Amino acid sequence: MLVLVLGDLHIPHRCNSLPAKFKKLLVPGKIQHILCTGNLCTKESYDYLKTLAGDVHIVRGDFDENLNYPEQKVVTVGQFKIGLIHGHQVIPWGDMASLALLQRQFDVDILISGHTHKFEAFEHENKFYINPGSATGAYNALEANIIPSFVLMDIQASTVVTYVYQLIGDDVKVERIEYKKS
């Protein structure tokens, strides 16, 4: 089961669109679920995601026009409970102790957060944490040179194989990370 994880697009305010090389990789009909950390900013970005997969889950980012997106969400995909937040609620941004507290409050196997615009994935106390970064490479409050990135999770039974796609220069680099639920 394939799950696309992305966020912080900031279209059209900070970027015009997803990188063309990412659009070529994101083929309709291949992905079953989309988990988005927010800051899509417009309905057009949401409509584009709906063309990729029927099951789209979005939480509200601090720049989203749609105030109907929830602040947080917990979804179950296969054997995994997955928590989804934008990440502006985590202080300081990306702080491990704050993320671990949210993971325990949500009682999830995987916690997905964004807001920092920087990819990160790691295991902590037998739980998995993912920040997909910014799919467009949009700048953030602290940094202008952001590497565009998104994550594709392949969920099979009690294992998640995470593929991280990063646009470095003109090349899409892919890294593989495996997490087994204990």
Swiss-Prot record:
- A molecular function GO annotation: metal ion binding
Kindly list the biological process annotations in GO that this record carries: endocytic recycling; protein transport; retrograde transport, endosome to Golgi
Record membrane topology:
Peripheral membrane protein
Cellular compartments annotated: Cytoplasm; Membrane; Endosome membrane; Early endosome
Q: Which InterPro entries match?
A: Calcineurin-like_PHP_lpxH (IPR024654), Metallo-depent_PP-like (IPR029052), Phosphodiesterase_MJ0936/Vps29 (IPR000979), Vps29 (IPR028661)
Could you list this entry's UniProt keywords, alphabetically sorted: Acetylation, Cytoplasm, Endosome, Membrane, Metal-binding, Protein transport, Transport, Zinc
N6-acetyllysine is carried by which residues? K50
- UniProt GO cellular component terms: cytosol; early endosome; endosome membrane; late endosome; retromer complex
Where it mainly occurs, coarsely classed, is: cytoplasm
Task: State the protein's purpose.
Answer: Component of the commander complex that is essential for endosomal recycling of transmembrane cargos; the commander complex is composed of the CCC subcomplex and the retriever subcomplex. Component of the retriever complex, which is a heterotrimeric complex related to retromer cargo-selective complex (CSC) and essential for retromer-independent retrieval and recycling of numerous cargos such as integrin alpha-5/beta-1 (ITGA5:ITGB1). Component of the retromer cargo-selective complex (CSC).
Query: What binding partners and quaternary form does the record give?
Result: Component of the commander complex consisting of the CCC subcomplex and the retriever subcomplex. Component of the heterotrimeric retriever complex formed by VPS26C, VPS29 and VPS35L; within the complex interacts with VPS35L. Component of the heterotrimeric retromer cargo-selective complex (CSC), also described as vacuolar protein sorting subcomplex (VPS), formed by VPS26 (VPS26A or VPS26B), VPS29 and VPS35. The CSC has a highly elongated structure with VPS26 and VPS29 binding independently at opposite distal ends of VPS35 as central platform.
Family that this chain belongs to: Belongs to the VPS29 family.
NCBIfam families to which the protein is assigned, alphabetical:
yfcE
**Protein name according to UniProt:** Vacuolar protein sorting-associated protein 29
